[in-house]
Amino acid sequence: MSERKLFTSESVSEGHPDKIADQISDAILDAILEQDPDAHVAAETAVYTGSVHVFGEISTTAYVDINRVVRNTIAEIGYDKAEYGFSAESVGVHPSLVEQSPDIAQGVNEALEVRGSLEQDPLDLIGAGDQGLMFGFAVDETPELMPLPISLAHQLVKKLTDLRKSGELTYLRPDAKSQVTVEYDENDQPIRVDAVVISTQHDPNVTNDQLHKDVIEKVINEVIPSHYLDDQTKFFINPTGRFVIGGPQGDSGLTGRKIIVDTYGGYSRHGGGAFSGKDATKVDRSASYAARYIAKNIVAADLAKKVEVQLAYAIGVAQPVSVRVDTFGTGVIAEADLEAAVRQIFDLRPAGIINMLDLKRPIYRQTAAYGHMGRTDIDLPWERVDKVQALKDFIASK
């Protein structure tokens, strides 16, 4: 009998409290970058019933109306009614942003590699904004080269949001969560969906039967390919029986608390650093994007079926302290050769990553819900596969 292996990932909608915080932080970042592409930003947000607190450190020449950005973001998410207990019009906004520490700025603005040097490479000028380790991952389970569980989980909550915003399901409210369990065969290939959990906030007048019927027909059956579903697939729709109170009225939210949702759903390792509210000199964000870019191009080049890339940095130093490529036995060449190719083809200094992926643009708010990786609905530079030929050429030359 073949071994049955299950793997589960979850996602949350843009109306989840932690995701509200992420979107506010990234909306502030984008507003600053629109005026000052060289700004250094670390904006954190906390939300709870009736209040939003924005705090952190910035260095910028820009002036941004934080109050307006916060309220616009909340309204766009869909918290625009007093009965939700959290609305764009009535929420209290409390900003507390201060100047970036000069000790940190010293290492970011002038990397170790150029201090005291007469010959300077411009891309050596920016040092990593902190120490840390970052992971990128790709696998051939889906067209976007993502693990199937997180891909489906994102699509489910995005579909709920689309149905809410289009007016097709008027009783839906902004907060929602999904969870998908996928069964894999002995070759680690996904063969079926074993369980789906969806909890969605709703108006008090909708019946559980109606909600259950609509979620099955209009969400699950529309999102999950039919060949993954069978009569053994379990559906848990609002299993508590009621989800009227949600969003920040139900739970407080904080930037950076959904880092597994933001990446690979637990299928790959995570270095621990969050993304939202941080400009690209923070390698927590930019190097994670670079690692995904590398991993996706390796799989797209058919050099491995599954690959995880680890990068690590020291604060104030431009060059990564380590680069590691793990193909989990699926690679067609030695991992040492792949690592050599990565170092040759991808500039992994912070300034190199920023240039390579054009990260000084205000593109971040759109990443703050439904995942930073594997997106097919928006054009993100780290999702492009434009290094495939360079990788193949390098390997062929060895």
Swiss-Prot record:
<keyword id="KW-0547">Nucleotide-binding</keyword>
<feature type="binding site">
    <location>
        <position position="278"/>
    </location>
    <ligand>
        <name>ATP</name>
    </ligand>
</feature>
<feature type="binding site" description="in other chain">
    <location>
        <position position="100"/>
    </location>
    <ligand>
        <name>L-methionine</name>
    </ligand>
</feature>
<comment type="similarity">
    <text>Belongs to the AdoMet synthase family.</text>
</comment>
<feature type="binding site" description="in other chain">
    <location>
        <position position="16"/>
    </location>
    <ligand>
        <name>ATP</name>
    </ligand>
</feature>
<dbReference type="Pfam" id="PF02772">
    <property type="entry name" value="S-AdoMet_synt_M"/>
</dbReference>
<keyword id="KW-0067">ATP-binding</keyword>
<dbReference type="InterPro" id="IPR002133">
    <property type="entry name" value="S-AdoMet_synthetase"/>
</dbReference>
<comment type="function">
    <text>Catalyzes the formation of S-adenosylmethionine (AdoMet) from methionine and ATP. The overall synthetic reaction is composed of two sequential steps, AdoMet formation and the subsequent tripolyphosphate hydrolysis which occurs prior to release of AdoMet from the enzyme.</text>
</comment>
<feature type="binding site" description="in other chain">
    <location>
        <begin position="175"/>
        <end position="177"/>
    </location>
    <ligand>
        <name>ATP</name>
    </ligand>
</feature>
<dbReference type="InterPro" id="IPR022630">
    <property type="entry name" value="S-AdoMet_synt_C"/>
</dbReference>
<dbReference type="GO" id="GO:0006730">
    <property type="term" value="P:one-carbon metabolic process"/>
</dbReference>
<comment type="subunit">
    <text>Homotetramer; dimer of dimers.</text>
</comment>
<dbReference type="GO" id="GO:0005524">
    <property type="term" value="F:ATP binding"/>
</dbReference>
<keyword id="KW-0554">One-carbon metabolism</keyword>
<dbReference type="Pfam" id="PF02773">
    <property type="entry name" value="S-AdoMet_synt_C"/>
</dbReference>
<dbReference type="Pfam" id="PF00438">
    <property type="entry name" value="S-AdoMet_synt_N"/>
</dbReference>
<feature type="binding site">
    <location>
        <position position="251"/>
    </location>
    <ligand>
        <name>L-methionine</name>
    </ligand>
</feature>
<feature type="binding site" description="in other chain">
    <location>
        <position position="282"/>
    </location>
    <ligand>
        <name>L-methionine</name>
    </ligand>
</feature>
<feature type="region of interest" description="Flexible loop">
    <location>
        <begin position="100"/>
        <end position="110"/>
    </location>
</feature>
<keyword id="KW-0479">Metal-binding</keyword>
<dbReference type="GO" id="GO:0006556">
    <property type="term" value="P:S-adenosylmethionine biosynthetic process"/>
</dbReference>
<keyword id="KW-0630">Potassium</keyword>
<feature type="binding site">
    <location>
        <position position="274"/>
    </location>
    <ligand>
        <name>ATP</name>
    </ligand>
</feature>
<dbReference type="InterPro" id="IPR022631">
    <property type="entry name" value="ADOMET_SYNTHASE_CS"/>
</dbReference>
<keyword id="KW-0963">Cytoplasm</keyword>
<dbReference type="InterPro" id="IPR022628">
    <property type="entry name" value="S-AdoMet_synt_N"/>
</dbReference>
<keyword id="KW-0460">Magnesium</keyword>
<feature type="binding site">
    <location>
        <position position="251"/>
    </location>
    <ligand>
        <name>ATP</name>
    </ligand>
</feature>
<feature type="binding site" description="in other chain">
    <location>
        <position position="57"/>
    </location>
    <ligand>
        <name>L-methionine</name>
    </ligand>
</feature>
<comment type="pathway">
    <text>Amino-acid biosynthesis; S-adenosyl-L-methionine biosynthesis; S-adenosyl-L-methionine from L-methionine: step 1/1.</text>
</comment>
<dbReference type="InterPro" id="IPR022629">
    <property type="entry name" value="S-AdoMet_synt_central"/>
</dbReference>
<dbReference type="GO" id="GO:0005737">
    <property type="term" value="C:cytoplasm"/>
</dbReference>
<feature type="binding site" description="in other chain">
    <location>
        <begin position="242"/>
        <end position="243"/>
    </location>
    <ligand>
        <name>ATP</name>
    </ligand>
</feature>
<dbReference type="GO" id="GO:0004478">
    <property type="term" value="F:methionine adenosyltransferase activity"/>
</dbReference>
<dbReference type="InterPro" id="IPR022636">
    <property type="entry name" value="S-AdoMet_synthetase_sfam"/>
</dbReference>
<feature type="binding site">
    <location>
        <position position="18"/>
    </location>
    <ligand>
        <name>Mg(2+)</name>
    </ligand>
</feature>
<keyword id="KW-0808">Transferase</keyword>
<protein>
    <recommendedName>
        <fullName>S-adenosylmethionine synthase</fullName>
        <ecNumber>2.5.1.6</ecNumber>
    </recommendedName>
</protein>
<dbReference type="GO" id="GO:0000287">
    <property type="term" value="F:magnesium ion binding"/>
</dbReference>
<feature type="binding site">
    <location>
        <position position="44"/>
    </location>
    <ligand>
        <name>K(+)</name>
    </ligand>
</feature>
<feature type="binding site" description="in other chain">
    <location>
        <begin position="257"/>
        <end position="258"/>
    </location>
    <ligand>
        <name>ATP</name>
    </ligand>
</feature>
